[in-house]
Amino acid sequence: LPCPVLANGNVYSAQKAAEVLKSTGACGLMIGRGAIRNPWLFRQIREHQRGEAVFVPRGTDVLIYVRALYEAVCSPAARESAQVQKLKKYLNYLGVGVDPAGQFLHQVRRITTAAELFRVCDKFLNHDRPMPLEPFPLALKEGDLMAGEQW
């Protein structure tokens, strides 16, 4: 095409970014959910493009990010329950890479207070193990709905 084209959709890792650029011939990427889930993604893409080792965040890195995100998006004037609900929207993107069984998201979705939120985050993220660069596949059960279709 005579104009630059950007690719978009499900770019969660530097490897996936490279694959999308190669397979589409696009001149760049638009990244949304992947950057919410992994705020180091742009750094990782640059490292991958330069042939360097890609930074892999540890659980503690993600825990620090969650705390910073809470401070950034929550207004002190808002009710605590509203602040928690707001952060839970972001944690839906992040949570798909925390544990393959989905227990983190299961617990997060039932939280109503900031204390509960940080207790669950500490339980799942207060460790030095590397976090997966790609989200875990969704484990759909019979009766679940996905994009309007029942499984």
Regions found by a protein language model. Name each.
Residues L1-A7, V11-W151:
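Alpha/beta catalytic cores of nucleotide-metabolism and tRNA/nucleoside-modifying enzymes
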